[in-house]
C-alpha cells in the first residue's frame, strides 16, 4: 500500500499524538501518561497480533483460528469484568455472553455460506464481534450494578409487594439493555451518510471495488447488531440474579456473589 509500506511511515502519525499531549499539558488535563501508555500498548499489541495472524495464515489451521478466537474471548471477558467491579461473578457472566454471541454470530455466517471457514475471514470478523460484545457487556454490567444500587428501595418495595427478583429489576434491565444497544443502532442508521465504517474504508484503501466493500460492510453491520443484542440480553439475564438470594431477597452486600 503506497505510503504505508514501512513501520516508519506509520510512526510519522505520532505528530498527531504530540498534538494531543500538548493540548493535555496546556489545559492541565493530566492525560499525558495515559496517552503515552495507550500509544505504546497499541503499537506493541497491533504489531504482535499482526505477526500472530500472519503465522496463523501460514498454518492454514482452523484449530489455530479457534484457539486464537477463544483467547480473544477470554481477554475480552477479563477486560469487561474489570470495568464492572462490584458485580458478582462478572467474569463468567461476561465470558458466557461474549462467547455465545461470537459462536452464534459466526456460526450463522458459516452455516449460510456468507463467509468461508478461513482465517482471513474468521479472525477479523471474530475480532469485530468479540470487541463489540465486550463493550456491550461492560456497559450492561455497569448499568445494572449502578441502577440496582441506586434504586435499592424501589427494588425492595417491589419485592415486598410480591414481585419476583426478575419482575423487580425488569425496568432496570430494560434501561440497561437500551443504553447498551442504542449506540450501535444509531451508528448503523448513519452509516454511509455521516461516516464510512472501518471495514469498508480498509478495503477501499487496499484497492478493493467500492461495491464489494459496501457488500462486506453490510454483512459486518448486521453481524454486529446480532452479536450486540445477544451479548446484552445474556448479560442482563445472567447478571441480575447474582444480586439476589435464592429466596428472591436483595443481598445486603451487593458486591458479594
Segment roles from a protein language model:
Residues 21-22, 50-55, 73-77, 103-111, ...:
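Alpha-helical transmembrane segments of multipass membrane proteins
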Residues 210-240:
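Hydrophobic alpha-helical transmembrane segments of polytopic membrane proteins
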Residues 143-180:
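Short cytoplasmic-facing helical segments at TM-TM junctions of multi-pass membrane proteins
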Residues 21-33, 75-86:
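C-terminal ends of transmembrane helices
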Residues 30-69:
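Loop-to-helix transition at the N-terminal end of transmembrane alpha-helices
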Residues 5, 9-13, 64, 68, ...:
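Loop-to-helix entry region at the N-terminal start of transmembrane alpha-helices
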Residues 37, 93, 170-186, 219, ...:
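Alpha-helical transmembrane segments of multi-pass membrane proteins
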Residues 192-220:
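Glycine-rich helix-loop "coupling/hinge" segments at transmembrane-helix boundaries
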